[in-house]
UniProtKB/Swiss-Prot annotation:
<keyword id="KW-0547">Nucleotide-binding</keyword>
<keyword id="KW-1003">Cell membrane</keyword>
<protein>
    <recommendedName>
        <fullName>Phosphate import ATP-binding protein PstB</fullName>
        <ecNumber>7.3.2.1</ecNumber>
    </recommendedName>
</protein>
<dbReference type="GO" id="GO:0035435">
    <property type="term" value="P:phosphate ion transmembrane transport"/>
</dbReference>
<comment type="function">
    <text>Part of the ABC transporter complex PstSACB involved in phosphate import. Responsible for energy coupling to the transport system.</text>
</comment>
<feature type="domain" description="ABC transporter">
    <location>
        <begin position="5"/>
        <end position="247"/>
    </location>
</feature>
<dbReference type="GO" id="GO:0015415">
    <property type="term" value="F:ATPase-coupled phosphate ion transmembrane transporter activity"/>
</dbReference>
<feature type="binding site">
    <location>
        <begin position="37"/>
        <end position="44"/>
    </location>
    <ligand>
        <name>ATP</name>
    </ligand>
</feature>
<dbReference type="InterPro" id="IPR003439">
    <property type="entry name" value="ABC_transporter-like_ATP-bd"/>
</dbReference>
<comment type="subunit">
    <text>The complex is composed of two ATP-binding proteins (PstB), two transmembrane proteins (PstC and PstA) and a solute-binding protein (PstS).</text>
</comment>
<dbReference type="InterPro" id="IPR003593">
    <property type="entry name" value="AAA+_ATPase"/>
</dbReference>
<dbReference type="InterPro" id="IPR017871">
    <property type="entry name" value="ABC_transporter-like_CS"/>
</dbReference>
<dbReference type="Pfam" id="PF00005">
    <property type="entry name" value="ABC_tran"/>
</dbReference>
<dbReference type="GO" id="GO:0016887">
    <property type="term" value="F:ATP hydrolysis activity"/>
</dbReference>
<dbReference type="GO" id="GO:0005886">
    <property type="term" value="C:plasma membrane"/>
</dbReference>
<dbReference type="InterPro" id="IPR005670">
    <property type="entry name" value="PstB-like"/>
</dbReference>
<keyword id="KW-0067">ATP-binding</keyword>
Length: 258
């Protein structure tokens, strides 16, 4: 079952620098939520707090709560590795493991989780590649390097790798920014398909993409460079793009700044 995410009073730091302040929002299950806003507004930081990926940077910490179906992501005894199994992530640039085959890329997380049976691995590889709309393109060359695929195929391979461990949430940090328009369309079509099984949160600088793929949109901004980013407005995407409540939101989506 896809997961609901409740964020309350979230403030994120990198050392002494306050990157984002007092974020409150609820992300509904099996929806696509887009995070938009100018560079430096904290949208990617908020995304990374949803599976504790920000903690890979020294001095990173958070205040507030992130609840996954009521369970505190930052509660005592919560294992970040277990969190990342539940909340998968796809990064800005396709990052297949360069020395691994397509098959090995997909099963990498499964093997880390202790799955060893060949029949189960084979089944999960096909399921995941089909889920990522990639199976028909690679089924006859699973033993070849994943890095030999095109950029768009590599990104879909990374999505297959992420969904192979059966997460409930998929985070996508500008997943199309390094791709050509045709590959971007393929990823957008895939996102529309995946939301029937996963809660999806996507960071994007592309306003048209946000309006096309998302059900809800969160607009983040900041007063000036060096200030913490803040959530300005969060609503259904149709509302944000047709009748935003905040002037800053309207100015941003209409291209007046950012």
């Amino acid at each position: 079952m896809a997961t609901r995410i409740d964020v309350s009073g979230l403030t994120a730091y990198y050392g002494k620098f306050k990157a984002v302040a007092d974020v409150n929002l609820t992300i509904e299950p099996k929806n696509v939520t887009a995070f938009i806003g100018p560079s430096g507004c904290g949208k990617s930081t908020v995304l990374r707090t949803l599976n504790r990926m920000h903690e890979v940077l020294p001095g990173a910490r958070v205040e507030g709560q992130v609840l996954l179906d009521g369970e505190d992501l930052y509660g005592p005894g919560m294992d970040p590795v277990a969190v990342r199994r539940t909340v998968g992530m796809v990064f800005q640039r396709p990052n297949p493991f360069p020395t691994m085959s397509i098959y090995e890329n997909v099963i990498a997380g499964l093997k880390l989780n202790g799955v060893r049976k060949k029949a189960l691995l084979d089944e999960r590889v096909e399921e995941s590649l089909r889920g990522a709309n990639l199976w028909e393109e690679v089924k006859d060359r699973l033993g070849r390097p994943g890095a030999g695929l095109s950029g768009g195929q590599q990104q879909r391979l990374c999505i297959a790798r992420a969904i192979a461990v059966e997460p409930q949430v998929l985070l996508m940090d500008e997943p199309c920014s390094a791709l050509d328009p045709i590959s971007t369309l393929a990823i957008e079509d895939l996102i529309a398909k995946l939301k029937s099984s996963f809660t999806i949160v996507i960071v994007t600088h592309n306003m048209q993409q946000a309006s096309r793929v998302s059900d809800s949109t969160a607009f983040f901004s900041l007063e000036k460079t060096g200030d913490p980013g803040r959530l300005v407005e969060y609503d259904k995407t149709s509302q944000i793009f047709s009748n935003p409540k905040e002037k800053r939101t309207e100015d941003y989506i209409s291209g007046r700044f950012g």
